[in-house]
Every structure is written in C-alpha cells, then in structure tokens.
A protein has these predicted regions:
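A contiguous, well-ordered beta/alpha segment that forms the leading edge of an enzyme domain
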Residues: 76-88
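Residues forming the flavin
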Residues: 1-79, 118-122, 127-451, 455-575
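Long, well-ordered early-domain segments
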Residues: 85-129
Length: 575
C-alpha cells in the first residue's frame, strides 16, 4: 500500500482504472466509459481475456428477456426461492437482489451498445432443477459466435480457448452445438461435418492461423467486448501487472503497476475496479486456505491467477470470505498443455464409474462438477484414498465417447494415442484386476463396484448415489442407453482408467463486497474508491454453483453495477 497525502501521485490519470481483462473487467470498463468516465484497463498477461477466454462463456441470468419468446417462464420470486434454497446460509439478500435486478439490464445494455449478443439455452437446466424455483433451461445464456477477423491485430493477443472446447483441438462449437454432438442428437453427424468443412475451407484464414475464425464460448465473449473497447478508444495495457493500490489516506486513488520493467503510478480519480481473478496459481495461498491436498498444477484455470487483487485488498484492511472454497471441477493432465482439462461432461455417460484407491465410489458421477469435488474431499478426509481418483470405463465407452484427452475410439483408435501416453496418461488392461494393479486400486473393491454398477444399468436406478436421477444428470447422458441415459454395463475389455485430480476453474474466496461491489472491511465499513468482482471477490453464490454461468454472470453484472455506482458517486461529488 502507498499513502500520499500531498495529492501528487500518478504518472497518468484516469477516472477509473480496471485491473484485469476478463468479461467482468471489460463490462465494467465499457459501462463506466458510457457513463462519461475516462477508463484504463491493465492486464498482467501478454494476452487478454483472463479465465473467461478459456471458459464456456455462459452467463446465468434468471428472468432474461428471451425466456418467454422461447416458450419458457421465470419470475423474480422463483429465482429468489431457488437461490435461497441452494445458496443456503451464505444467502446475502442485498447482493442477490442486486444481481437479479441488474443481470437482465446488463445483457440488454451490451446487446444495444456493444458487439456482445447472448442466446438463451433452452434445455440447459439449472444444476439443481428439482429444488424449489429450479428451471429446466433458459436461464443460461451463451455468447453468439464472433468473427475473429473483426478484431484485426487484437486477435493475436486474445487468450486461446481451451482445446477441450474444440473439435480436434481446432474447430469451435457453441454450447448448443456441443450438446447436440456429444449427446448424439438427431442431425449431430451432419452438424459436425458442416463445422469441420467450414473450418477446412476457410483458406484465407488458415494462412494466418490454425485457430478457428468463428469464435465461440468464452473466446467469443471476450472478443466481442474487446471490439467494443476498441470502438470506444478505451486503452488496454497488456504485460502491466498491478503491484499495489495507492491511497490518499482516506480513499483508494490509484494503482502502482509495472510497465516496461519499472514502477508506474496511475491515478484513478473516481475508483479502482479489481477484476483480476482468484489465487489458483498461488501455491502459498492454496496451502494457507484450501482443503488438503491441493496443488496449483491441478487447476484448469490460466496460470496467471495468483491472488494479486485479493492480496492488495488485504493490505488495505479488506475483509475476505469463502477462502476455503473453489469452483471445483475434476481435472486430468494433458502432456504439453499449461493447465489441466476439466472433466465436465464425460462423467455423465454410461459405462463408466469414478472410484478411489479402495475401488469404491464416493459420488454421483453425473453431479454438478463442484459437488464432485466436495464429495471427493469429504470422503478423502475419512479414507485418505480419494486423491487422486480414477475414472474407469470399458471398450464400448472408449469407442463411443470423448474422454478428457481422447476423442472417441471410433475417431481416434488406440493406435493413434500419442506415444508415451498409454500407462502414463491413459491406462489400459485386458481385465479389471490387471487395470487395478496398474493404477494402485484395490482389485476386489473395484470388482464389487463394477458389479453393482452393472446391476444399476439393468434396472436404471442407482440406489447408492442416484446417477441419472434428474434433468441435469441426464443432460450429457446418452439417450440411446436405456432405461437410464447415464448408466450402462462396464463389461467389454479392454478396460481403461484416467487419473482424476481435484481441480477447479477458479477459487471462490476473495474480498468481501456489498451490493454495489464496494470492498468492505471486517467491521462492514466501505473502503472508499475500491471495487471488486469476479473471482477477486467472495462469490455471491456462496459455497454453491446454482447453474451454468454462475461465475461469469455475476462478474459481468457486478462490473455493470460497480460502474454505475462510480458514475453516480461522481455526480454526487459535483452537486
């Protein structure tokens, strides 16, 4: 922290400085600019987009204006009922109300004034659709595809999407397209062929880059926002890490960054917005706050998120909350990639089971991914056998479905698995007993578990954990598998195993904020001039994950809210 009571700080001056370049950060920057404020965005990395760029890009917006037109229904009362039930003891009525009230306004604002368009996803259910106020779809919205050519030179500094979201690591899909293909719905093969043909025949773009011109998911979202920044002349400085916040004794009035290898002071006359991610890549903070064991290399988040904003806030006396929680997801290692890949959909397919070192199940494999991680650690506390866990599947699963690092065997047979991956990344054996020996899992326990799973496949009812028992479970199931799309016999040799680590797409804990995104001290007082959102702030959703897009939706909404509050405070100051 720097304190300058002589008001001489700053090598440059803006009304607002935004730290970070994900969707929440850029939404705050756009809204502040459009309210008449001068804005600078600073990003520590040499590429922009943050965690948003590698994400699915969805936003969870109850009561959005597309629901009725698509044949659905929603209401504020239902959304409040659902969140009160799901969020539970962490329910903050004022913050939740601000989120529900401003989320649809934020979407409408971006649609009208920026390049950013969203499409509601009709059949993507809330993560707990059977809870009070839960919905079978519509609340999640995904960004419309965006033509990368519209970015010009800024395409070169857009953080690349996760290869896991692309066909063959190259070809982009929307969320709706991905579901059609993964669930093998009617027309899926024709759709996949059309996407591949479009990519292959884009000769002009292929000469520039192997990346797809048609951006989707998180890449489409940050690209559209970056184009809107450019249109307004809002500067985004890359390779500019924040080193500290600056105060004039009473309020935050700027930041000290590193620019061209030296300290550079930036005065922010009206506010600083911290939107620079969580602490996934900071092993010391993980060791201090998260359940054990925990390793930064297990994360699916970009390795730039080291808790800079959280630590800067703590230095000013800010309060923190939820520091022991993450937006958890099971992850798998991929040689040559900087981060692990999340297992988002593979667990829902039939003919697979997740077990610990004892060969026992500990969770409904199809459950929302944060619940899998909660269960993984809860059971590990008793057994010390869950880290790592293992996804076990048979030859029929291998043939039909993608899994972590591999395309379906019908497309990528074992003969095309990269050299050195067998019995290192993916394990294979002629029998379950042999497979258990290779991976250090109790053979008898595994055999008993598979026998029970095969019985559940016949009846369609998982009496232990209820796999396939609700609408969300079945979303990525295989509709051709009867009577339960998430259950099938594990019986065809060879058998396979994939190591599963307790990773995350981001940490949940961060600076405690109010309904205006202002950072608070432990006594509830406001740190004037300082705002936080996204994973730099403690999650408005508490320890839970109500639906797809519950990370980015609040980040963007509170970016919008923060900008409005800064603008209103500016107006009050000059009255």
């Amino acid at each position: 922290m720097h304190d300058d009571r002589h008001d001489s700080f700053g090598d440059a001056t803006y009304d607002v400085v935004v730290v970070g370049s994900g969707a929440g950060a850029m939404t705050a920057a756009l809204r502040a600019h459009d309210q008449g404020l001068s804005v600078l965005v600073v990003e520590k990395s040499t590429v922009y987009g943050g965690t948003t760029a590698v994400s699915g890009g969805g936003i969870w917006i109850p009561c959005n204006d597309q629901i009725a037109a698509l044949g659905g229904s929603d209401s504020y009362d239902e959304a409040i009922m659902y969140l009160r039930d799901v969020v539970g003891e962490d329910f903050d009525a004022r913050r939740i109300d601000a989120y529900l009230d401003n989320g649809p306004k934020m979407v409408a604002y971006l649609a009208k004034h920026a390049h950013t368009r969203f499409n509601a996803v009709p059949r993507y259910p809330d993560y707990y659709p059977d809870r009070k106020g839960g919905k079978p779809g519509y609340r999640t919205m995904e960004p419309a595809p965006f033509d990368a050519a519209r970015l010009g030179a800024h395409f070169d500094t857009l953080r690349a999407p996760s290869p896991a979201t692309l066909i063959g690591g190259r070809i982009a899909m929307t969320q709706i397209e991905a579901h059609t293909i993964l669930a093998k719905e009617r027309g899926w093969l024709r759709l996949a062929a059309r996407l591949m043909l479009r990519y292959a025949t884009d000769f002009k773009w292929r000469r520039r880059t192997p990346r797809d011109r048609r951006l989707t998911l998180g890449n489409a979202l940050v690209a559209s926002l970056r184009a809107a920044l450019e249109q307004r002349g809002i500067a985004l400085w890359l390779a500019t890490p924040m080193r500290s916040l600056h105060t004039d004794g009473a309020r935050v009035n700027g930041v000290v960054v590193e620019r061209d290898g030296r300290p550079f002071g930036i005065r922010a006359t009206h506010g600083v917005v911290l939107a620079c991610g969580g602490f996934e890549a900071n092993q010391a903070m993980r060791d201090q706050y998260l359940p054990k064991p925990t390793r930064a290399e297990w994360s699916a988040a970009p390795p730039i998120n080291t808790g800079d904003g959280i630590r800067a806030g703590l230095a000013l006396g800010a309060d923190v909350a939820l520091m022991g929680f993450v937006w958890g997801v099971p992850t798998v290692r991929v040689p040559g990639e900087e981060k692990q890949r999340g297992l988002f959909v593979e667990r829902s397919a039939p003919r697979c089971v997740m077990v610990n070192r004892l060969g026992r199940r500990f969770v409904n494999e199809s459950a929302p991914y944060p619940d899998v991680i909660h269960a993984m650690y809860a059971d590990h506390a008793n057994t010390q056998a869950n880290v790592p866990a293992w996804l076990i599947f048979d030859a029929e699963y291998r043939k039909r479905y993608p899994c972590g690092v591999l395309l379906p065997g019908s497309v990528q047979p074992d003969s095309r698995i990269p050299p050195g991956w067998l019995d290192s990344v993916i394990y294979r054996a002629g029998s379950l007993a042999e497979l258990a020996a290779k991976i250090g899992v109790d053979a008898q326990g595994l055999a008993q578990t598979v026998e029970r799973m095969n019985g559940y496949a016949l009846t369609g009812i998982d009496t232990e954990f209820g796999k396939g028992g609700n609408l969300f479970d079945r979303y990525y199931g295989d509709s051709s598998s009867k009577p339960n799309p998430c259950l099938g016999p594990i019986e065809r040799a060879p058998f396979y195993a994939l190591r599963v680590d307790p990773g995350e797409i981001g940490t949940k804990g961060g600076l405690r904020t109010d309904a205006h995104a202002r950072v608070l001290r432990s006594d509830g007082s406001v740190i004037d001039g300082l705002y936080a959102l996204g994973n730099t702030s403690a999650a408005v959703m508490g320890k839970t994950y109500p639906g797809p897009g519950s990370t980015i939706g609040p980040a963007m909404t509170f970016g919008y809210v923060a900008a409005d509050h800064i603008a209103a405070a500016r107006s009050d100051r000059f009255l």
